[in-house]
Every structure is written in structure tokens, then in C-alpha cells.
């Protein structure tokens, strides 16, 4: 029963994640946390694998159909590659940071409370920015070193929180690179792909992969790919303003789940 429920959550989250460019993990992680039936490290790993599968499909399809002449790819290599490189480095740092914070608490649930609290604050800030973004003057960074630093910050946060990416990716891309919604969504998935790849590789190399139900992982990964396929298709057809509305509604839901999780972990 729980495997079926997890698959439904992963598929739905991956569809929405592919549409909005937030990866899906920002939904999967807090929702699975709310059920409170798996260890935090297991949820982080399974969520990361699902997000990686979804972004892998999205990025590969984007590169295949994305010759600049076709106009279908919105990833600019000049900024996209250093962002991805920074995200890869950040993925390693975020993974290490999570284990460091976890080691500070005898009760692992307290580490979950820290994650939920940070995600709540980040999502609230993202919501405020999204609502008032028309009044905010944005930047247009193109320097490679700056792109690497921005990517590293995003990669660190996503790996530490176990969410793959999340709304913060889009806000950072809006502000620092003056991207529109759909361009930011595609570049966000590109960043998430590299961040999650290095995080998962690091887990394998350091032999820190937690014990988990293999069948559940297989189903979640398949749902991640299926959700990515459907979400990418829907994203092409939806107007940018509808993507914005979905994004705002999603952030409100995420904040409510985070509040519940903080109360649940600390209660």
C-alpha cells in the first residue's frame, strides 16, 4: 500500500516539477517526511534518485531537440555549463553538510526538523519574491566564476535539503540572470541534474547509501521518468502565466507541509 502511495506521490510531483522546473523533490521529500515511516536518510536518497531520473529524461530530451535553430532549448551553454559545474561541487558539499548536521543530534528526527525549517523559510522568501518580482530590478550575470558560485550555492542547498532543487532555483535564475519563467525552468532542471548526479555518486563512493526497499526505488524511478515525460509535454503547451500560478500555489502547499513537519518532528 505504501509503495503504491509513494509512486503516486512521485509521479504527481515529477509532473509538476517538470512543468515548473523545480525537480519534484521539493514535493516528494516533505510529503514522505509527513508520513514519518522511513528514516530521513532513506527519504533523502529515494527522493534524490527519483529527481535524478526525472531530470535526466528532461535534460536529455532537451539536448536532443534543442539545437539552437529549433528554438526548443532554452539552455545557454555560456552560463548553463558553469552553473552546472558549480551545482556539481555544491552537491558534494551539501551531502557532507547533511551528514555533519545529522551527527549533531542523537534523534535523527531533529535533523528532519532543521531541514523542514530551512525549506519553510526558503519557500516563504521565494513566494514573496515571485509575488513582487515585477517590481524588482534583475541582474544579468555572464561571468563564469560568478555562475559557478551561484551554482554551488544552489547545489549545496538542494543536496542538504534532499529536495533536488526547489523553488529557490527559479528565483535565483530570475534575479541573477533575468530569465523568463520557462527559460528558468529548463535551466533549473539542468542544474538539478548535475547536483543530484554528484550527490548520488558521492553516496556510492563513500558507501553511505542507506538500506532501502529496492522494489520501491525501481517504481519511484519509473514514476520519476514518466512524470518527467508528461510534465515536459505540458510545459510546452502552458502559457508562462499559468506556470507562474501553478508555481505560487505549489509554494503555499509546500509551506503548509513544512509547518506540519516541523511540528511533527519537534512535538
Model regions: which residues?
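Residue-level hotspots within the lipid-embedded alpha helices of multi-pass solute transporters
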Residues: 18, 155, 159-163, 196, ...
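Transmembrane helix-bundle signature of multi-pass membrane transporters/permeases
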Residues: 14, 44-52, 88, 185-196, ...
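Interfacial segments of multi-pass membrane proteins
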Residues: 28-42, 168-183
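Juxtamembrane transmembrane-helix boundary motif
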Residues: 1-14, 33-42, 60-154, 205-267
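Central hydrophobic cores of alpha-helical transmembrane segments in multi-pass inner-membrane proteins
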Residues: 51-59
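Alpha-helical transmembrane segments of helical membrane proteins, especially in multi-pass transport
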Residues: 195-202, 206
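Short helix-coil transition sites and intra-membrane helix breaks within transmembrane domains
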Residues: 15-25, 158-166, 183
